[in-house]
């Protein structure tokens, strides 16, 4: 959700989604988890970071393995930032990326460096984009139901036009899509 919307606010709960994604890795036994962010709206970054911190601190784990790159959230950034993580935190055993494109870029860099995913390093993304299904290994990701969000936004707009009212906030559920990268 936008932190300060002008009017209607329809979307997923980014805090809860990032919490669930991070919690899943912790439950699977990962101990040294990093978070890779890239240029995105400040409010989205804050929500992702809040969900991340909440999960990490709940388990008394260090939430300090975070890189917020001032670069676009694409394949190249994911590939270029993985070495930065490994240099700063060689003990890294899992990487949460705020987009599937970042995660797939990190996966490509893992392949180039002969890092076995998920045996040596788990990598997860966010968004369930088409590329998450075809990268190798297929990417575990958080599904963002874009069609449903769009449908609800259209419905809300019609309700507003026809009836003059609408609740200002509606949460659409995201879901974890487990694949082979963790």
Q: What would you call each of these model-derived segments?
A:
Residues 2-182:
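Bacterial carbohydrate/catabolite-sensing allosteric modules
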